[in-house]
Structures are given as C-alpha cells and as structure tokens.
Amino acid sequence: MGMTITEKILAAHAGLKAVEPGQLINAKVDLALGNDITAPLAIQEFKKLGVKKVFDPERVVLVPDHFTPAKDIKSAEQAKILRDFAREQGLTHYFEIGRMGIEHCLLPEAGLVGPGDLVIGADSHTCTYGALGAFATGVGSTDLAAAMATGELWFKVPETILFRYHGKLKPWVGGKDLILYTIGRIGVDGARYMAMEFTGEAITNLSMEGRFTMANMAIEAGGKNGIFPVDEKTVEYIRGRLQRDYRIYQSDPDARYNQEIDIDASKIEPQVALPHLPENARSVKEIGEIKIDQVVIGSCTNGRLEDLRVAAQILKGQKVHPEVRLIVIPGTQQIYAAALAEGLIATFIEAGAAVSTPTCGPCLGGHMGILAKGERALATTNRNFVGRMGHPESEVYLAGPAVAAASAVKGRIAAPEEVVK
C-alpha cells in the first residue's frame, strides 16, 4: 500500500520504511520554533531537564513577534528571556526587533524551511510551512523543550484528507477564500488530527502566498497539518532562499485517504467568516448591511506582499471611511521594504491607514488595535473566537485582503466590486 506525502515525511524522519495512520513514532525534527509567548515556558522546562545545550543551535529558532515591540513590562521581560537564552546557547536564528517578522511569514522568507522538512513550533499556525511541501505542526511548550534538548519528538501518524480544487478562480478570490469556504464546508473539527492535502487545477494556479494562507488555516479545521505537493512554483520560491539540500515527496497513486473531497473552485465567491468561528463562512454577497469599526490587513495569514498589493489596488485613490480605523501590518521587514519601494505604503497612508512594524499585535488581542465593547472588526487574520481581538462583547469577521480593503472604504462589509468597477 502506498503512502501520502505526510506519511512519507514522518517515516523518513523516524528512520522507517513505512508508517500508517494511528502509529506512534519518534522522529527527528529539522527545526524547532518558539515565540515570545510560548518559548519562555519551553526555556524554563528545558532548564529543568538539566541539559546544558540545545541539540543544534542552528535548528532552534526564536522569534519575539506576538508583543513586539514590547507593549509593557511583562512582554518586555518575556522577550528578554528569549534574548538571553539565544545568547547563552549561541543560537544562529534569533530575530531581534528590526530583523524580526511575524514568524510564519519570516521563516520561509529566510530560507529556514524546505520541502520534506519536519518542523515543530510552539504556535498552532506552524502548519503554514506545509505550503512548501514540509510536515509542519504546532506543539505545546513542554514538547518544544523536549525537542530543543533532544532533536526528536513523538508523533501519532495522522490520516489524510485529500482536497481537489477544480476550475479557475473568479476575480478577487484567493487562498483565503478557498480555505474559508473549505472550513465552512467541513467545520472547525472536520479534519481533526488529520493531514489536509491540497491539490487540483486551482491549487496548481494558486500563488505561493495563497498556499501559505491555506496551509496556515488548516488548524482552523482541526487539522494536524496542511500540505501541498511540491511543484515548479515551490521550487522557484525556495530558489535563492534555501541554501541546503532538500527532498521532495509526493503521494503514491495508491495512497490511502480518510476521504477525498472535490470542490468546484470556479463557483467560490469572496468569503467572509462571521463571528465566532471560522466555519461561519458566507459569500460576501450574502451578507447584509454590517457596519464595522476597524479593519486589519496583515498577520501570518495575509501579511505577505501579494496581500498588500491586492489591498493597495483597491485603496488606490480611495479614502478610508471616516468611521473606520484601518491598520496595515506587513508580515516582515523585507515585505515592508518591498511594499515601500512599490509605493504600496504611500497608497495606504494616503487612503488614511495606519501602517505598523511587523507584529502579531491585534490578531490575538495583544496590542496595536484592541477592540472595545460592542465594536466590530473585519480582519485578514485566522481566528474570530469570542474576545479574540479584545473585549468579549466585540466581534471579528474574517476575510481576504480584497474584501478587507473594500470594507475599509465603505464602512461596512463590502465586495471588492463595490469599490473597483
């Protein structure tokens, strides 16, 4: 019996010829990631183990991105724990303010993840790297501590759901719309502890930015990981970034899947997920008059250059509605610089937006855009749980950058065609 991409990567890293769903394995990790929320606890647990050095200072990555720049004394102390540990251990990849970016935008850009890798991170959206044909999944801080010490971790081999997306996408439809539609169809637990393998004509034609967005939100369907077959676009993306060898895995024709789901992507409209779950996805055209107070364009889901280009295309020559706050957050310093060079930042500022240094900030209700009681936000982020962006009686709607930009102009949730004719 054949194996899926996910099964092949896990088998290779466990030193086994084959694995099957449900099997418990111990596998070597290529990269272990922590941030300013999760790494302090991992570092504390690491020190309790009595281990003096991490397994490999080039393969432990620390990124202070959630509360950076530090918003208060506590967050400053959290970041200092990372900074001190990185110095003590001689870590190659500690990303300080000025070099920092939102971790899941930053690591692929920096060439730290490649096809066939096994990556664990103490952040649930570590699954983003599946866009590169890697097995990447989120873990807890104690598991991160174990991986930092040993370079290995235990896994239960997941079953895989195969998604095939057929047809050509409509204008303004991107990866965010595909994944919101998918989560709306299968539910937030529809892929619980399963690999989500994305294939089909629409995926072949989807940009790498769109693929990162889809893989990023696999966890929002309960997925263990999201993964894409490596193709020419993948190889082109890593060319000049990844400075080491890698291995490409493809699913066998006779691989076993939990289920196979076919989706006509040509019929998908720009999507909006209503409070308070990502599964509450609707076509933007089905949504009535919903006024908003704030729009956030950015995050590890949609803070890449293509996302900013889409938003700027709609905002060019427009003004943000006087009753709306628009916050734009590029995912990394490199993305910020590229957006500046292309004139995108000027477009945002001229429209009336606030542009921030890279940070997770408002996505988790941390800083840089917290909602007050009764306020509504539309965001290109990945979660809209109760209180996610601030007050428990606020609301968050999820959408892609096109809908977000149009909504910022209209002062209500709006389709891109309402602004760009």
From Swiss-Prot:
The keyword Cell inner membrane does not apply. Pathway: Amino-acid biosynthesis; L-leucine biosynthesis; L-leucine from 3-methyl-2-oxobutanoate: step 2/4. CDD domains: IPMI (cd01583). GO terms for biological process: L-leucine biosynthetic process. Gene3D superfamilies: Aconitase, domain 3. Binds 1 [4Fe-4S] cluster per subunit. Keywords: 4Fe-4S, Amino-acid biosynthesis, Branched-chain amino acid biosynthesis, Iron, Iron-sulfur, Leucine biosynthesis, Lyase, Metal-binding. The keyword DNA damage does not apply. It holds the Pfam family Aconitase. [4Fe-4S] cluster binds at residues 300, 360, 363. Its cofactor is [4Fe-4S] cluster. Its EC number is 4.2.1.33. One of its GO terms (molecular function) is metal ion binding. InterPro entries: Acnase/IPM_dHydase_lsu_aba_1/3, Acoase/IPM_deHydtase_lsu_aba, Aconitase_4Fe-4S_BS, Aconitase_4Fe-4S_dom, HAcnase/IPMdehydase_lsu_prok, Homoacnase/IPMdehydase_lsu, IPM_dehydratase_rel_enz, IPMI_cat. It catalyses: (2R,3S)-3-isopropylmalate = (2S)-2-isopropylmalate. PROSITE patterns: ACONITASE_1, ACONITASE_2. SUPFAM superfamilies: Aconitase iron-sulfur domain. Catalyzes the isomerization between 2-isopropylmalate and 3-isopropylmalate, via the formation of 2-isopropylmaleate. Belongs to the aconitase/IPM isomerase family. LeuC type 2 subfamily. Heterodimer of LeuC and LeuD. This is 3-isopropylmalate dehydratase large subunit. It comes from Moorella thermoacetica (strain ATCC 39073 / JCM 9320).
